[in-house]
Curated annotation (Swiss-Prot):
This is Homoserine kinase. It comes from Clostridium botulinum (strain Okra / Type B1). It is found in: Cytoplasm. It catalyses: L-homoserine + ATP = O-phospho-L-homoserine + ADP + H(+). HAMAP family: Homoser_kinase. ATP binds at residues 82-92. GO terms for cellular component: cytoplasm. Its main location: cytoplasm. NCBIfam families: PRK01212.1-4, thrB. Catalyzes the ATP-dependent phosphorylation of L-homoserine to L-homoserine phosphate. Its EC number is 2.7.1.39. GO terms for molecular function: ATP binding; homoserine kinase activity. Keywords: Amino-acid biosynthesis, ATP-binding, Cytoplasm, Kinase, Nucleotide-binding, Threonine biosynthesis, Transferase. GO terms for biological process: threonine biosynthetic process.
């Protein structure tokens, strides 16, 4: 049996649209074994127990590339990453599927080949890359090849995810984005993405509040998330370092100083006054990324 653990991820990190992402310590686990015949799923809803399951789709993509044909598969899923909340649940399934398939097939593909294949299936590297590598990454796709660099994050920072009880599909969140942008808005984001990376590198955490600003996606998507701006404003009142939409949303991610002990309690009290229910989860950066049979990929 192959056991694969994949972390949740938070993409964009404010201005780094489709290129910045960070792995955090929420996990999905996948237990996969080859059986004599059939396709058996455990740990997911009945509607996902078929060949359209994203984990199986990713596995088949890997098997086809390698030229391996399993006799049958049993796939058990232990999922802690909330679905359609902007925390990389689909990326985790894709990565988990591809990595487990590669292990079953004898490890024919190297890490670079696995990463490129996962991005081909998922479509964007911003979640897939940190899910593979752990930590924070800056990544691009160039002629179907994934190019990335790890972003050093200085000690002394943590994250807090505000996770609502409603979902938001990536398709719907992308549909509200404009077909084109103003040149000045592109410059706005380029500068703040550079500032974000530099501030995290150097521990200049007081600059994050400026670096979190964005003109490419957050304001368009905010209208799909009830009370986004009031929550953001309250987070800022509670001395957060920065607030941004996690991936396509609807989860709101907050950056905090490590020593901040009061934020979670205080923001939870505020969120309880709102219509929807919100879960508050303090998180750390996951530095390992994908783990296969208790070893780092």
């Amino acid at each position: 049996m192959v056991e694969v653990r994949v972390p949740a991820t938070s993409a964009n990190i404010g201005p780094g649209f489709d290129c910045l992402g960070v792995a955090v310590n929420i996990y999905n686990k996948f237990f996969v074994e080859e059986i004599e015949d059939g396709l058996i799923f455990e740990g997911c809803a009945d509607k996902f127990k078929n060949e359209n399951n994203l984990i199986y789709v990713a596995m088949k993509k890997c098997f086809d590339k390698i030229g391996y044909k399993p006799t049958g598969l049993r796939i058990k899923i232990e999922s802690d990453i909330p679905v359609s909340r902007g925390l990389g649940s689909s990326a985790a399934c894709v990565v988990g599927g591809i990595v487990s398939a590669n292990e079953l097939a004898g490890g024919a593909l190297n890490k670079k080949e696995l990463l490129d294949l996962a991005v081909e299936v998922e479509g964007h590297p911003d979640n897939v890359n940190p899910a593979f590598c752990g930590g924070m990454t800056a990544s691009i796709s160039d002629n179907r090849e994934v190019i990335y660099s790890k972003v050093k994050v200085s000690e002394g920072i943590k994250f807090c995810a505000l996770i609502p009880d409603f979902t938001l599909s990536t398709e719907k969140a992308r549909a509200v984005l404009p077909k084109s942008i103003d040149y000045k808005d592109g410059i706005f984001n380029v500068g703040r993405t550079a500032l974000m990376i530099s501030a995290l590198n150097n521990g200049d955490f007081h600059l994050i509040k400026y670096a979190c600003k964005d003109k490419l996606h957050q304001d368009y998507r905010a209208k799909l998330i009830e009370n986004f701006y009031s929550i953001k404003k309250q987070c800022e009142k509670l001395n957060s370092l920065g607030v941004f939409l996690s991936g396509a949303g609807p989860t709101i991610m907050v950056m905090l100083r490590e020593e901040d002990k009061d934020f979670s309690k205080n923001i939870k009290s505020f969120l309880e006054t709102l219509k929807n229910k919100w879960e508050v989860r303090e998180l750390k950066i996951d530095k390992l990324g994908t783990v296969v049979n208790n070893r780092k990929l």
